[in-house]
Amino acid sequence: MWKQILSKLPKKSSSKNHSSSSSSTSKSSDNGASKSGNSQTQNAPPVKPSADSGFKEGNLKGNGNGFTPYEALPGFKDVPNAEKQNLFVRKLSLCCVVFDFSDPTKNVKEKDIKRQTLLELVDYVASPNGKFSETVIQEVVRMVSVNIFRTLNPQPRENKVIDALDLEEEEPSMDPTWPHLQLVYEILLRLIASPETDTKLAKKYIDQSFVSRLLDLFDSEDPRERDCLKTVLHRIYGKFMVHRPFIRKSINNIFYRFVFETEKHNGIAEFLEILGSIINGFALPLKDEHKVFLVRALVPLHKPKSLQMYHQQLSYCITQFVEKDCKLADTVIRGLLKSWPVTNSSKEVMFLNELEEVLEATQPPEFQRCMVPLFRQVARCLNSLHFQVAERALFLWNNDHIENLIMQNRKVILPIIFPALERNTQKHWNQAVHSLTLNVQKIFNDIDAELFKDCLAKFREDESKEAEIGAKREATWKRLEEIGNQKQKSSL
């Protein structure tokens, strides 16, 4: 009975049989690969490499002992025209293998083969023979995706955010895979820009998911990659109109996250550079959506401590809006005043630079709406102990348009800033600030001597009152001190 039960159990295969089976499978695989040659590379399913092979992903055929050699395919000039497109697709598949660049001594030959193949692909895309087929577009996007979409591993940046000056001085982090990445980006760029690319076909593969992943790469620490991404995204925005609202909204969300959550992102300057071109192309009158973007996304970008890294591009975008619609000047200036730095003098100089650019495009009605709070802030800048801040504020009078705006409204503005000007002439430590202040006073005195005289009299009257109040305050404290001393003595 036991024998009958045991005989029904499945027998465990011996290690010898297993080895024999594995060997025969390997031979079969080798034979199949040798028969099919390179033509099977295109259709072969990807096989994941071993951990130490140096390959991340690819289409190399397994043979039981490792992989078929990573070998160069024939050149385009060596095949008939009818075969060139098939060869192009095969070369794209070959370039889907991603190498490990952390060790420069590993896979040197294979890396060079891939680089040469990528160069051939760049030339082929740049000089196509007719429209690109859907298969070609699909394979190009697949190859690009395999190579560029990866997890970014940023270096710790806690200290970088604290001081933008340190961030600017540090050497940028360079991606070791750039010799391949650069060519991959070039292929993508040429595909998008090519007149032989059918937009209707391409948008199936360059879709919102692709664009979203592309936007994520802007946080790369390599400035060369961000520069390529900037060009690629700009081309996509220009060619694929269907993606325009999505791109604007996505950048908007990245700005929100940067301003209100992380204050960490490497690609803000590049995004703003793209937006500067986009804003320049906005049709008039501006849509409400675009005005909301200005108020909720661009103006708050003045708050982060790393403003210096992207201020030039931000200032250009802001100025573009005001030039397109001068009624936005009041909104922009009040936004600047709301974010005005209190303890960061270098940032304050940047704000004054931007303020001049905005005022350059501001018309009298908008200027009059915001001139009171604006020149209260300018007065504080005039009295700044940091000579560059005071000097930059005084330079506003060197701009003819701004000087005209001020002089048209001098009866409101001069009483606000006169105390600051007078204190500079009396107390400021810097000789350049002292001289510039005298020049500004002379401008007002030459245009409206009576107003200047009234403001001077008012200033002296206020100074006298302040001195009296100060003397009374001092006498009161002295009296309180005497009373306290008397009580202390009496208690003893």
From Swiss-Prot:
Annotated compartments: Cytoplasm, Cytosol; Peroxisome
Disruption phenotype: Reduced plant size and fresh weight.
Stretches with biased composition (Low complexity): 16-39
Main location: cytoplasm
Gene3D superfamilies: Leucine-rich Repeat Variant
Protein's UniProt keywords contain Cytoplasm: yes
InterPro entries from the UniProt entry: ARM-like, ARM-type_fold, PP2A_B56
Transmembrane portions of the chain: none
Listed GO MF terms: protein phosphatase regulator activity
Domain of life of the source: Eukaryota
Entries under SUPFAM superfamilies matching the protein: ARM repeat
Induction, per UniProt: Induced by epibrassinolide.
GO-annotated cellular components: cytosol; peroxisome; protein phosphatase type 2A complex
Annotated motif Microbody targeting signal, positions: 490-492
Key words, A-Z: Brassinosteroid signaling pathway, Cytoplasm, Peroxisome
Tissue specificity of this protein: Highly expressed in dry seeds. Expressed in roots, cotyledons, rosette leaves and flowers.
Renumbered residue ranges of the record's region Disordered: 1-63
GO biological process: brassinosteroid mediated signaling pathway; negative regulation of brassinosteroid mediated signaling pathway; positive regulation of fatty acid beta-oxidation
Function text: The B regulatory subunit may modulate substrate selectivity and catalytic activity, and may also direct the localization of the catalytic enzyme to a particular subcellular compartment. Associates with the serine/threonine-protein phosphatase PP2A catalytic subunit C and regulatory subunit A to positively regulates beta-oxidation of fatty acids and protoauxins in peroxisomes by dephosphorylating peroxisomal beta-oxidation-related proteins.
Assembly: PP2A consists of a common heteromeric enzyme, composed of a catalytic subunit (subunits C), a constant regulatory subunit (subunit A), and a variety of regulatory subunits such as subunits B (the R2/B/PR55/B55, R3/B''/PR72/PR130/PR59 and R5/B'/B56 families). Interacts with BZR1. Interacts with PP2A2, PP2A5 and PP2AA2.
Family the entry assigns: Belongs to the phosphatase 2A regulatory subunit B56 family.
Protein name: Serine/threonine protein phosphatase 2A 57 kDa regulatory subunit B' theta isoform
Native source organism of the sequence: Arabidopsis thaliana (Mouse-ear cress)
